[in-house]
């Protein structure tokens, strides 16, 4: 059963300055996302899509992102490149509180914008 759906869109240009700010990276992104970031040649786009996914996750929860650290929401990929979300700490606790057991995520981007949609599935409590 679908518990929640969230979508977010961001301007990629907003993240250009973030590509040179390690402090911001550590604040908003999981350590493994930062490792992947440094391997990626389209860095602002990389950050924008992941940030949009984190925002979309908060919207899908129905609570927003208050009381959780964005770095505890990790965007990663399976072996075929399909994105997936892993959540830790307060983000994981909030997911469990909704009855959520599965998270679906899709990312997309164009020249100027990046977007993400998140669907939380499970059994409502």
Swiss-Prot record:
Q: Which GO terms describe its molecular function?
A: holo-[acyl-carrier-protein] synthase activity; magnesium ion binding
Query: Which terms are listed as keywords in the entry?
Result: Cytoplasm, Fatty acid biosynthesis, Fatty acid metabolism, Lipid biosynthesis, Lipid metabolism, Magnesium, Metal-binding, Transferase
Record's Pfam families? Answer: ACPS
Q: Does the keyword Lipid biosynthesis apply?
A: yes
Q: Does the keyword Magnesium apply?
A: yes
- Could you say which EC number(s) this protein's record lists? 2.7.8.7
**One biological process term in Gene Ontology:** fatty acid biosynthetic process
Q: InterPro entries, from UniProt?
A: 4-PPantetheinyl_Trfase_dom, 4-PPantetheinyl_Trfase_dom_sf, ACPS, Ppantetheine-prot_Trfase_dom
Annotated compartments: Cytoplasm
Positions binding Mg(2+) in this chain are 8, 55
Gene3D superfamilies the UniProt entry points to: 4'-phosphopantetheinyl transferase domain
Q: Which GO terms describe its cellular component?
A: cytoplasm
**Catalysed transformations (reactions):** apo-[ACP] + CoA = holo-[ACP] + adenosine 3',5'-bisphosphate + H(+)
Q: Which cofactor does it need?
A: Mg(2+)
Top EC group = transferase
Q: Which HAMAP family match?
A: AcpS
Q: Which family does it belong to?
A: Belongs to the P-Pant transferase superfamily. AcpS family.
What NCBIfam families would the database entry show?
Answer: acpS, pantethn_trn, PRK00070.3-2
Q: What does this protein do?
A: Transfers the 4'-phosphopantetheine moiety from coenzyme A to a Ser of acyl-carrier-protein.
What is the name listed in the Swiss-Prot or TrEMBL entry for this protein? Holo-[acyl-carrier-protein] synthase
